[in-house]
Amino acid sequence: MSPLLEVTDLAVTFRTDGDPVTAVRGISYRVEPGEVVAMVGESGSGKSAAAMAVVGLLPEYAQVRGSVRLQGTELLGLADNAMSRFRGKAIGTVFQDPMSALTPVYTVGDQIAEAIEVHQPRVGKKAARRRAVELLDLVGISQPQRRSRAFPHELSGGERQRVVIAIAIANDPDLLICDEPTTALDVTVQAQILDVLKAARDVTGAGVLIITHDLGVVAEFADRALVMYAGRVVESAGVNDLYRDRRMPYTVGLLGSVPRLDAAQGTRLVPIPGAPPSLAGLAPGCPFAPRCPLVIDECLTAEPELLDVATDHRAACIRTELVTGRSAADIYRVKTEARPAALGDASVVVRVRHLVKTYRLAKGVVLRRAIGEVRAVDGISLELRQGRTLGIVGESGSGKSTTLHEILELAAPQSGSIEVLGTDVATLGTAERRSLRRDIQVVFQDPVASLDPRLPVFDLIAEPLQANGFGKNETHARVAELLDIVGLRHGDASRYPAEFSGGQKQRIGIARALALQPKILALDEPVSALDVSIQAGIINLLLDLQEQFGLSYLFVSHDLSVVKHLAHQVAVMLAGTVVEQGDSEEVFGNPKHEYTRRLLGAVPQPDPARRG
């Protein structure tokens, strides 16, 4: 039986002003009918370029070589009008950002119907509209008849992604290509979208190629996985074999860096040191060698081939025998055990009582009038203790970020009270508020947006010091000390943010936040924008800083696995209220509220054995 999709020696090169960049370097794989194959790897590994080459959606300046056969038909080299007969009919595509995949000026029903009419001209408009409603029902949109008349902006993010899936399966495709289909979604919505994709596969019988960096999604959904690094496949196997008996040190590192719900608070992860190589002019040898804990001289001379190491299991490594049976912590020589917390009651550094924050709803353009209000935070009470972490979790719109902003405002709330370091913020004068701000600093979600690209690292870190009267010598000494603390080199002080990886940028943001020796750090989704291998290093750094300096963390996140590693106490928010809070081990291990149980049940676990 011939495969549904057969890719052979696929290479993708992008012409640039400098050296050409070969983003995909001779990969080969196949997808059988009804099979789910996952491409996984860090950002820049070439997985999205490899997938978009299959469907012919790369930019014009991309050079594609090799062979891509769909049911025996060669797709590479087809003219665009010929390729368009495959797109949307034989091949359905689900993109990461549904808003960019949908036209804002047409209803979602019209957009699904259009996909049917383009590829099935004999189907009339009315029949296409009826089929569009059926597809909305299939992908789980409530009241599909009415919602088919909605515009994309009138739907939630999860609903928009369901519409994109409906368009992708509208013509019963043979192959579904899903490019990070759940990345931007809340955990419960992510679980629902995976269920919809499973249903779509079962209904259409399509093979699925899914691109993701989430190893939990791979374990939950995929049958086989291709691990990509520096533009090529470095390990491929069935998902059960890959997770149980991985043979490539890179795969070991990826799995070791994943936060887990079953880990104790304070457990260190296994980060992969360094960053992926530039694909413009790779050095000889194995591209992973500079980051590999098992590297030997032979690794630096020739790039290893992808060879069989077991039945249907291949790896590109000459040291696979040193990987078998060893943990990631052992291979990467990292101590992961949680360190015992100091005993005794710690003082309360942030106390929130009956906090309320409302936003007025207004109607009209010229003569606006109030028509109601939204209670973004509805009477919540929280406590953060010295040297501890309070995790505030919940889905988008739950009120967790609003709560954090109200605390950081250091001003009288609409209702209720906020105490920071024993002071009621409603009583603060201008000078007292400025002084207190030194003790509570923020690390933002997006390290790129929080750093001025025009300033070198030294100026970025020195800015709060200079604003608070530090002298020149004192500032230089403190910046050098902060670079040491967050694991950067002194020479990095003269470089600019654009020269650093995402994880290094976040370390710069943390160094800046620590400059004035605060007692409290507010962490607003500090690792959600990072690859899992980089995220692990930041989580370890935050744990080490808390242990070293006795910092207190207010940690806002939608990622329950990350919260489990960091938080001593957890508050679960829903619709502006705290529905459950307490010790993190108790809340995660024995949740009492149905919403908490639903959140925990939706988290994809990096263990195929737990697959439902």
Curated annotation (Swiss-Prot):
ATPase activity is stimulated by the oxidant H(2)O(2) and significantly decreased by several redox agents, including the reductants L-ascorbic acid and sodium dithionite. The 4Fe-4S cluster plays a structural role and might also affect the ATPase activity and the regulation of the substrate transport. Its EC number is 7.4.2.6. It catalyses: a [peptide](out) + ATP + H2O = a [peptide](in) + ADP + phosphate + H(+). ATP 1 binds at residues 43-49, 61, 96, 213, 495, 499, 503. Keywords: 4Fe-4S, ATP-binding, Cell inner membrane, Cell membrane, Iron, Iron-sulfur, Membrane, Metal-binding, Nucleotide-binding, Peptide transport, Protein transport, Repeat, Translocase, Transport. It is a peripheral membrane protein. Gene3D superfamilies: P-loop containing nucleotide triphosphate hydrolases (3.40.50.300). Changing residue 292 to S: Shows a significant reduction in the proportion of OppD in the Opp complex. Strong decrease in ATPase activity. Its main location: membrane. Residues 5-255, 350-600 form the ABC transporter domain. One of its GO terms (molecular function) is transmembrane transporter activity. GO terms for cellular component: peptidoglycan-based cell wall; plasma membrane. ATP 2 binds at residues 147, 158-159, 396-402, 445, 558. GO terms for biological process: peptide transport; transmembrane transport. It is an enzyme of class 7 (translocase). The complex is composed of an ATP-binding protein (OppD), two transmembrane proteins (OppB and OppC) and a solute-binding protein (OppA). Part of the ABC transporter complex OppABCD involved in the uptake of oligopeptides. Responsible for energy coupling to the transport system. Glutathione (GSH) uptake by mycobacteria through the OppABCD system contributes to the depletion of the GSH pool in infected macrophages, which impairs the ability of the macrophage to detoxify methylglyoxal (MG) and contributes to enhanced production of inflammatory cytokines. Binding of ATP leads to conformational changes: the dimerization of two nucleotide-binding domains (NBDs) of OppD and the rearrangement of the transmembrane region of the OppABCD complex, which is the key step in coupling ATP hydrolysis and substrate release. Belongs to the ABC transporter superfamily. This is Oligopeptide transport ATP-binding protein OppD. The gene is oppD.
